[in-house]
Amino acid sequence: SYAELIRQVASEMPGVDLTGIGARLVWTPDRRFSIVPEDAALAVFLQDCDEVAARQAAAKLRPQDEAGRAIIIEWTTARAGRVPRIYVEARQDLSVPLVLQRRMQELVPCAHCISLDCGHVPQLAQPGELTKQLAKMLAGFSTTRPATA
């Protein structure tokens, strides 16, 4: 889970700020959903985006079911790598610090990486560069299905 990842990295790298958005979340009474306040979204998710676009994006955020962040994926050697994966690394991400992003990439081998010098929302902060790099990478993927054993 994401919480476990944070605990692991925090124990290995004391003093590294891994707070992200966590401290600014607002919770429903049953703690099943978290809500990102607009000011927090602007400061942590959208800090490098056009101000008007950032405000529009922040206004569209909705409560998030915490079950999604608690998921633990079980990878198998037989299935891992059958579907090409692209990780978009956001080097200035204030929500998921780069050290956590890189650890996630280590845990899911064989992913291709696009590294952008932007915050948490590259599709809004650098849409042209993201599209260019995605198109280039996708053009290199095979369109045929791999043989099954």
Spell out what each predicted region is.
Residues A59, P63-G128, F141:
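Conserved serine/cysteine hydrolase catalytic core
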Residues L134-R145:
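Short, hydrophobic alpha-helical segments
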Residues R7-P14, L46, D50, R62, ...:
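A generic structural signal for secondary-structure junctions
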Residues R55, V99, K132:
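Short, contiguous clusters of charged residues that form electrostatic/catalytic patches at enzyme active sites
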Residues T28-R82:
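Conserved alpha/beta-hydrolase catalytic His-Asp/Glu region
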Residues S1-E38, G68-R69, I73-E74:
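Flexible "cap/lid" loop of the alpha/beta hydrolase fold
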Residues P127-A135:
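Short, amphipathic alpha-helical "lid/cap" segments that border enzyme active or binding sites
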